[in-house]
Structure formats: C-alpha cells, structure tokens
Amino acid sequence: MTHWPSPAKLNLFLYITGQRADGYHTLQTLFQFLDYGDTLHIEPRRDGEIHLLTPVNGVENEDNLIVRAAQLLMKIASESGRLPAGSGADISIEKRLPMGGGLGGGSSNAATVLVALNHLWQCGLSIDELATLGLTLGADVPVFVRGHAAFAEGVGEILTPVNPPEKWYLVAHPGVSIPTPVIFKDPQLPRNTPKRSIDTLLKCEFSNDCEVIARKRFREVDAALSWLLEYAPSRLTGTGACVFAEFDTESCARQVLEQAPEWLNAFVAKGVNLSPLHRELL
C-alpha cells in the first residue's frame, strides 16, 4: 500500500475579468497549496481493474473524480502503448477537505491519482501530458498536477509559476456547501474586473470577486468572515464556502483558533509553494 498527499489550495486572490460565449468565466487568480489535505492510499492491482474502496455518499463511483482520473489515465496510456499489461489499483481516501468548500478537494484528488498512478504503473507520461488530461476533468486539476504555486488566467488553465510568501492560515468552514454554479450564475457577480499584470496584482491588496455574492447569499459565510476579520486580513477562497485569515506565525494563528466559536469548523495550516504531493516524489 502506498500513501499520497492530496493537498488543499487557497485562492489568495480571485478576479473575474469576463465571460466567454460558452458561458465560462475568465479570471485571474493566485493559487497556493496548504500543508493540509486528504490522503490517498493506493495498492496496485494486476488484473486491470480500478476499485474505489471508500465511496463518497451521494456520488456514484463512475462519477467520482478519483475513478474518472484513474480510468482516463488507463485509457490514454493504453492507447499510446505505455500501459503495462494488467495495470489496475485499489484506491481509498482519508477525507479531511469538505466538498463545496473552495479548497479544491476533488480536483486535488484527481491530480494525485494521475501523478501517483503514472508513477506506480510506470506509464512515463510527462507532467505536461498529465496536466492536459487533468484539464478535461476540471479547470483546477492542472495546478495540482504541476505542483507549484501559480498565477492562473483564462478559465484557470493558463499557469505561471510564482513564489508568494508562505504564510500561516486559519481556514474555517462555516458549515455550508456552495456549488460553484450558484456563485457564477448570480446576476450581481462582478464580471468585468480589469485585467492586470501579475506584478501589479502582487502589489495590490488581495480580494475575491466572489466574496460579496457568497456573503449575501449565505449568512454562515458572512458570519465566519465577520468573526475572522476581527483578528486578521481574511477572505473567501474560490467560490467558497471556506474562508481564511492570514498570519505571519503559527502561534498567532493558533491563538485565534483557540477562540473560534463552536459552530465554526477550523484548522491551521501553512501555505506552501511546492505541493506536498511533489515533495513526496523528490
């Protein structure tokens, strides 16, 4: 049995710069990983079968991103003659990241499966090839595959590696799940934030265009942010529901965590520019 990190991400900022004819929104965002997340346990099989041993409630196995990623890699590697005969896997997950939280849990799971099985099966696909596969599973998958903090543009697929400060974060889940379409379909969502260079954006105060909608529509998000903002700069990650506050030291973050209200599920983690998944491969 092998063990693989599937880290969370934060959007340190997120600006929506337009909407394409196909309905997808264009954006500028800054991804950074956390040293906190899910863990995947993978045991290679020799009978060509993929088994997910820990099903997710309400999600059919064939719709689960873990299974879809494994089957996609199997298909593409087989078609290009790079899949050793009988390659399969038993996969289980220790889930710590909430669904609908804006921490990238499902995308991270898919990326970990692609990277881990490519290694375990010895398929030999490049990171570029794996990232291209990942994009067909979700816009956030490629950044997890590439494994480095990045400035993202387009619909999130145009990535430029960057090295923002590795701060400590108190991340809080307010107890609601926010489906991404709920935010992106809201008529009051800002959709025309001017595009700026990465250098300009890194000098500006960070914010998230989705935050005003999440706070308006979900009182739990509003309450969580109102509490965090009493202590430190805080904002929404992704389309929510998780919010985070940033601190210069772990001790400062933990002092605030100790005062968290009982209704708030929170943890402290460090921002890291190299993904824990890729540290595992070094």
From Swiss-Prot:
Which reaction(s) does its UniProt entry say it catalyses? 4-CDP-2-C-methyl-D-erythritol + ATP = 4-CDP-2-C-methyl-D-erythritol 2-phosphate + ADP + H(+)
Q: What class of enzyme is it?
A: transferase
Q: Which SUPFAM superfamilies match?
A: GHMP Kinase, C-terminal domain (SSF55060), Ribosomal protein S5 domain 2-like (SSF54211)
A Gene Ontology molecular function term for this protein is: ATP binding
Q: Which UniProt keywords apply?
A: ATP-binding, Isoprene biosynthesis, Kinase, Nucleotide-binding, Transferase
Similarity annotation: Belongs to the GHMP kinase family. IspE subfamily.
| NCBIfam families the UniProt entry points to | ispE
The record, for HAMAP family, names: IspE
- Quaternary structure and partners: Homodimer.
Protein name in UniProt: 4-diphosphocytidyl-2-C-methyl-D-erythritol kinase
